[in-house]
Amino acid sequence: IGSGAYTENSMVMGTAEGGLKIMLYNVNAIDIDNPYIDSDNPYQDKSNPNKDLNYYFFHTMHHEFAHILCQKKSFPTDFNLISASTYKSTDWINVKDADAPKDGFVSGYASGEANEDFVEIYSIYVTHTASAWAKILHDGTVWTKDSTGKEVATDTKGTDAILEKFKIVEDYLKNSWNIDID
């Protein structure tokens, strides 16, 4: 769809319907003469007028594709329990992507509810570099400096939750769809 779609408080980048169809929105924003792709930065600057094809389109395609997979075959319900007490429901819009890992999420949007959390893990992992994924995991840990100035992990709950959920995503893809996420 050429134009954007909006809810009362956010822009809709894509939808997945009936286990068959994916719709992408705002494709008129693509600058075909000057494509911009950033797979190294896991925290997109959404104020940048140059639309990052990775964030706005490739990530969205994979995000919606993962919804299609989950509409066809449900993922294990154990996933829902890992962050059950920390989902933000409608307040996810106020969670900055760079702050989300400390709470165990790969993006602010992932903090909304389990289905979005699951597909965000998949879509961010497959559309970003290994160093971008490592940054998310690093940012999921609270770090302090010891007396020598060396970083010391003081709280790994965020990283631990992301890795636990990632393992479920990885196993689901392998066991349900014979997809190796790597």
Residue positions per predicted region:
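Active-site-flanking segments in enzyme catalytic domains
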Residues: 3-9, 13-182
